[in-house]
Amino acid sequence: PDRAIARLSIDRLLIVKDEEAYCQPCVSPVWDTALTAHTMLEAGGERAKAAAKAGLDWLVPLQVLDVKGDWAEQRPEVRPGGWAFQYNNAHYPDLDDTAVVAMAMDRAQGNTSSHEFDPALARAREWVLGLQSRNGGWAAFDADNTYSYLNNIPFSDHGALLDPPTEDVTARCISMLA
């Protein structure tokens, strides 16, 4: 049974079509919806704007407002306010998705008199500002997780124990705050 369950789990990662097959180890509905909203807003037109708004409305209740995840270990005083990459991962919202979602919401209501996304935007801003690392940058999930000695642990050969600030996440956070 354990082997059968493991095999079924692996098989569910595979997407097999007539002309191609690929592995999709995770789904990214929040990220995909936010990027699609940006695309629709860029395209313009009433149908595209309505589609973007529908996607953003879907994202509003996915904002993590009441769960302090691992990030709170470094920043216990910061209130939650981010979005996770997946459908439901309240303990691990990430700054990258949060910045992209917030920018799309701000953009969607920017040319209107609507303020319906203001509460979500305020919490996102608060959370992003609260997780800025001491060196001025932002990481994906945490603040000040730069302890490189962790990479010397034998089982950490893939280097996933750290979450240092990166240029791309920092750029998106700065863009969101601008």
Task: Report the location of each language-model feature.
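Preference for long, amphipathic alpha-helical scaffolds in soluble/luminal domains
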Residues: 1-178
